[in-house]
Amino acid sequence: MGGRGRRALIAPVVAVILGAGVACDSQSGIPTEEPPSDTVSAPAPAAADPTTTVPPAPVPQVVVGEVPGNPAAVDAVRAWATDLVTRPGTVPAKCWTLPPAQAADQYADTSAILGALAQPGVDGQFAVSWTGGGTTVSVKRSEIASGYACPHVHPAGTVDFYTPADAEYAVTRFLSRESDAPVNGADTETAYPLICPGFSPWDPSGTGNGGRPPLRLDPDVLAGTTAFATDAMTATPVRGDYLEVSVPVTDVSGVTNTRQVTLSIGPDGYCLGEVN
């Protein structure tokens, strides 16, 4: 066949081959689309919860019965009672005017104290008292004036609720002041009187010839004290409200003598009237 004839035969064959190639490309040729990926997209992180502020628990309102004409007494004892309920651990350091062991014992029955305080208060000669359920809570005027009244708690009807421990602690506080180491920086004679005021004749021996307390006349008789032995203190009743505390006292010269301090009960509890 001539060249034109061969070209005529070849052209259809090429066309057939090309056609077959195109047809096969859609089945088994090189893929024209990427296969689906095996990678799984991580879920979007959940939105964080908005921060919430928990409001502080409300401070319990301690109910204190009114004292006609003396609202300061109510406020002062409420400040103490609120601490007793909400922050009892802070009370001992704040109530340094009482013997520590005595305060711990008297303040143990919180419910009895709150029950008494809820009753109307009575403004007496030297103290304000609340009584209820067989318990009396009494605060001295010096405690009220401080704005934070640490009371005496005692059975209702008790007349002489001050104890020898109160007398010994009064001597401890006085000697601590004299040795320039007060039990608290606020413990001064002006704010918390420890020397008997002399409202009544000083007469521990019952002679009938009493006068002003000697310590009132000479308050510096124990000035220069450098040390004293609290663990060696002894308290001895004398007569009526009078009580004598013996205590070894060391002066600036280093000499130690046992001193006898006579006390009585005054407006602020046990007060010192005489030193021998």
Where are these regions (language model features)?
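N-terminal export and membrane-targeting signals
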Residues: 1-15
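Core segments of small alpha/beta cavity-forming domains
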Residues: 54-109, 157-209
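C-terminal motif of bacterial Sec signal peptides marking the signal peptidase cleavage site
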Residues: 20-23
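Short beta-strand edge/turn micro-motifs at domain boundaries
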Residues: 25-27, 118-166, 253-276
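Short, low-complexity, disordered segments immediately C-terminal to signal peptides
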Residues: 25-47
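Extracellularly exposed regions in secreted/surface proteins, prominently low-complexity, repeat-rich
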Residues: 211-276
